[in-house]
Amino acid sequence: MTDSDPTLRPDRLPEDVQATDDRALRPQSLDDFTGQEEARANLRVFIESARRRGEAMDHVLFHGPPGLGKTTLAQIMAKELGVGFRMTSGPVLAKAGDLAAILTNLEAKDVLFIDEIHRLNPVVEEILYPALEDFELDLVIGEGPAARTVRIELQPFTLVGATTRLGLLTTPLRDRFGIPTRLNFYTIAELDQIVARGARLAGIEADPKGTAEIAKRARGTPRIAGRLLRRVIDFAVVEGDGRLTQGIADSALTRLGVDDLGLDGADRRYLSLIAENYHGGPVGIETVAAALAEPRDALEEVIEPFLLQQGLIARTPRGRMLAHKGWTHLGMAPPKRPDQGELI
């Protein structure tokens, strides 16, 4: 049911890393999927409604931080609907012809998944509008005075878009998705279930305290939990007795630079920079990006969401500031702020 045509995905995307290992760990149905209770409950209703009506399901937009299951949910949707699944990404669709080639090859009610949909070429996006609303494709053939428009009828299909940057989607595109769904960070209990399931599928005997230790440090993200689990298993096999215990998990993750809260070296450099160089802020994001030699997008999409969710930093109109919890995590005392009497 899943089309893995390499022409659709010539470049490896972030979720393709460790794809072979992840495929076995990915749930195959909504019942197997852990977490995102509200999103799953709603999707179950929409899927069942589409099946009973015998129609293509309305278009879906998944948005939220990376690694929370957007691709997995799209694949599950296709399986639950009993239809074909095609996958591509925004940057790959450089020309209108690229999109036309995919859309014209879709069967009735198929699911087309476009990752990083906020990075669609504006020209391609314009072509997508009538396809989403009327299942029609308007293509311009030829150039200059000889140019003419050809309308192509499409089979009804379901577009599933995924983005980590909802604000970068144009309003016309965003409004054409009938089912916008936000995915949130997972709880430690949910991640514990995911880690335990992963260990079981890997054939590793896991102590409940061991899986809980990994879940606690997984930053609320299943993809990170899976990556940490694989590394802890490596340590358990080589330096332990093959069992995943709390001791081996703590030792392995500490050696990998992942602390008790799940922060890694990049996170701690971010916090330390604001604390030591800018006295806790506020400091502009461009300044932080330049000082860390990291792209602004990487900070806003990868590092900051979890720090904000944990209350370690704050975004203000004047820039980023270290919150009290951030100072505490670094083991530092926040600088004393001058009171009004001292200012006068």
UniProtKB/Swiss-Prot annotation:
Residues involved in DNA binding: 296, 315, 320
GO molecular function, one term: four-way junction helicase activity
NCBIfam families: PRK00080.1, ruvB
Lineage: Bacteria, Pseudomonadati, Pseudomonadota, Alphaproteobacteria, Rhodobacterales
Protein name in the entry: Holliday junction branch migration complex subunit RuvB
Binding-site residues, ATP: 25-26, 67, 70-72, 133-135, 176, 186, 223
Organism: Jannaschia sp. (strain CCS1)
Main function: The RuvA-RuvB-RuvC complex processes Holliday junction (HJ) DNA during genetic recombination and DNA repair, while the RuvA-RuvB complex plays an important role in the rescue of blocked DNA replication forks via replication fork reversal (RFR). RuvA specifically binds to HJ cruciform DNA, conferring on it an open structure. The RuvB hexamer acts as an ATP-dependent pump, pulling dsDNA into and through the RuvAB complex. RuvB forms 2 homohexamers on either side of HJ DNA bound by 1 or 2 RuvA tetramers; 4 subunits per hexamer contact DNA at a time.
Region of interest: Disordered: 1-33
TM annotation in the entry: none
Catalytic activity: ATP + H2O = ADP + phosphate + H(+)
Domain-level remarks: Has 3 domains, the large (RuvB-L) and small ATPase (RuvB-S) domains and the C-terminal head (RuvB-H) domain. The head domain binds DNA, while the ATPase domains jointly bind ATP, ADP or are empty depending on the state of the subunit in the translocation cycle. During a single DNA translocation step the structure of each domain remains the same, but their relative positions change.
Residue numbers spanned by region Large ATPase domain (RuvB-L): 1-186
Region ranges (Head domain (RuvB-H)): 260-344
Ranges for region Small ATPAse domain (RuvB-S): 187-257
GO biological process, alphabetically ordered: DNA recombination; DNA repair
Compositionally biased region (Basic and acidic residues): 1-25
Assembly notes: Homohexamer. Forms an RuvA(8)-RuvB(12)-Holliday junction (HJ) complex. HJ DNA is sandwiched between 2 RuvA tetramers; dsDNA enters through RuvA and exits via RuvB. An RuvB hexamer assembles on each DNA strand where it exits the tetramer. Each RuvB hexamer is contacted by two RuvA subunits (via domain III) on 2 adjacent RuvB subunits; this complex drives branch migration. In the full resolvosome a probable DNA-RuvA(4)-RuvB(12)-RuvC(2) complex forms which resolves the HJ.
Keyword terms of this UniProt record: ATP-binding, Cytoplasm, DNA damage, DNA recombination, DNA repair, DNA-binding, Hydrolase, Nucleotide-binding
Positions that bind Mg(2+): 71
Entry's localization field: Cytoplasm
CDD domains: AAA
Family under the similarity heading: Belongs to the RuvB family.
